[in-house]
């Protein structure tokens, strides 16, 4: 089984891909899809669409976990929601089962507290995946935490 965890954004979409093999969690890939601020918004959304399609075609995940978006008073709210829509559309078009989790759910599942710090979540990601150094950038570590939340729900803790 392979899962892709996704931390949505317009400037940066974090992703993490984990495989379960012989009851062991194996990190296959993680990183970010970055879109340049100098580009028009529609071009940035298309870049997310294109790059996410390529990732999925390459890694062929069976499951997807996406962080739920909470509305904040911000000038980027609509852009992030649009990027999330593109992400959900790509996953649905590939017939990948999608689960969504709030930040508090992810923190609770991964670090044991819905109010866990970034460092506590990062430490839990490193522990769960037996990593010697933290995944970079932070958006990819967040995406791995999202994927691990789904795996925990599936019984792989």
Swiss-Prot record:
Its cofactor is Mg(2+). One of its GO terms (cellular component) is cytoplasm. Its EC number is 3.1.21.10. It holds the Pfam family RuvC. Gene3D superfamilies: Ribonuclease H-like superfamily/Ribonuclease H (3.30.420.10). GO terms for molecular function: crossover junction DNA endonuclease activity; DNA binding; magnesium ion binding. GO terms for biological process: DNA recombination; DNA repair. Mg(2+) 2 binds at residue 67. Keywords: Cytoplasm, DNA damage, DNA recombination, DNA repair, DNA-binding, Endonuclease, Hydrolase, Magnesium, Metal-binding, Nuclease. The active site is at residues 7, 67, 139. It is found in: Cytoplasm. Binds 2 Mg(2+) ion per subunit. InterPro entries: RNaseH-like_sf, RNaseH_sf, X-over_junc_endoDNase_Mg_BS, X-over_junc_endoDNase_RuvC. CDD domains: RuvC. It catalyses: Endonucleolytic cleavage at a junction such as a reciprocal single-stranded crossover between two homologous DNA duplexes (Holliday junction). Mg(2+) 1 binds at residues 7, 139. Belongs to the RuvC family. The RuvA-RuvB-RuvC complex processes Holliday junction (HJ) DNA during genetic recombination and DNA repair. Endonuclease that resolves HJ intermediates. Cleaves cruciform DNA by making single-stranded nicks across the HJ at symmetrical positions within the homologous arms, yielding a 5'-phosphate and a 3'-hydroxyl group; requires a central core of homology in the junction. The consensus cleavage sequence is 5'-(A/T)TT(C/G)-3'. Cleavage occurs on the 3'-side of the TT dinucleotide at the point of strand exchange. Homodimer which binds Holliday junction (HJ) DNA. The HJ becomes 2-fold symmetrical on binding to RuvC with unstacked arms; it has a different conformation from HJ DNA in complex with RuvA. In the full resolvosome a probable DNA-RuvA(4)-RuvB(12)-RuvC(2) complex forms which resolves the HJ. HAMAP family: RuvC. NCBIfam families: PRK00039.2-1 (NF000711), ruvC (TIGR00228). This is Crossover junction endodeoxyribonuclease RuvC.
């Amino acid at each position: 089984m392979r899962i892709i965890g996704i931390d949505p954004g317009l400037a940066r979409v974090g992703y993490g891909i984990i495989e379960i093999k012989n009851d062991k969690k194996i990190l296959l890939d993680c990183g970010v899809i970055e879109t340049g601020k100098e580009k028009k918004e529609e071009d940035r959304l298309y870049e997310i669409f294109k790059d996410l399609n390529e990732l999925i075609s390459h890694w062929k995940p069976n499951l997807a976990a996406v962080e739920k978006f909470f509305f904040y008073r911000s000038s980027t709210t609509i852009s992030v929601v649009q990027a999330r829509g593109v992400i959900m559309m790509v996953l649905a078009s590939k017939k990948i089962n999608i689960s969504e989790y709030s930040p508090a759910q992810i923190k609770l599942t991964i670090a044991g507290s819905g109010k866990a710090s970034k460092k506590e979540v990062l430490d839990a990601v490193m522990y769960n995946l037996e990593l010697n150094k933290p995944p970079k950038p932070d958006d990819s570590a967040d995406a791995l935490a999202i994927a691990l939340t789904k795996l925990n729900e599936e019984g792989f803790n």
